[in-house]
């Protein structure tokens, strides 16, 4: 069984962009958000640590672009785009669940597992 969740072309994800893909084999219908910030790709489960609801339904609205933070559509919680830690809102100090990302040969690969910091 593979740990790979998604493989996408690098050019599909621009700086301060976000894409949403299905999380395979989950009974809850969870999705994965893939973001690019300061050139680095990161992936998060689309679930707010405040109440488990989706951060967004449309990735075009995930970013709070002035502050360059990820924003939950429900309670406007703001998350650090590098660490996933909530900086403002009802879940301050809690973190999004991150996934492993690797960008190589013009492809972004998202895999199950906890990412290394950075």
Q: What residue ranges belong to the model's regions?
A:
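N-terminal pre-ligand scaffold of iron-sulfur
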Residues: 1-63, 81, 95-118
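Short, P/G- and charge-enriched loop/turn segments at secondary-structure junctions
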Residues: 8-9, 87-89
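Mid-chain, well-packed structural core segment of small domains
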Residues: 58-88
């Amino acid at each position: 069984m593979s740990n790979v969740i998604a493989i996408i072309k690098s050019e599909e994800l621009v700086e301060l962009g976000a894409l949403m893909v299905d999380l395979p084999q989950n009974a809850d219908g969870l999705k994965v958000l893939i973001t690019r910030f300061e050139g680095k790709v990161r992936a998060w489960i689309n679930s707010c640590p405040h109440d488990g609801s989706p951060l967004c339904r449309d990735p075009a609205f995930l970013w709070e672009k002035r502050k360059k933070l990820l924003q939950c559509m429900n309670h406007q919680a703001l998350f650090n785009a590098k660490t996933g830690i909530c900086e403002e809102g009802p879940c301050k100090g809690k973190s999004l669940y991150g996934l492993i990302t690797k960008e190589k040969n013009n492809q972004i690969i998202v895999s199950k597992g906890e990412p290394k910091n950075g």
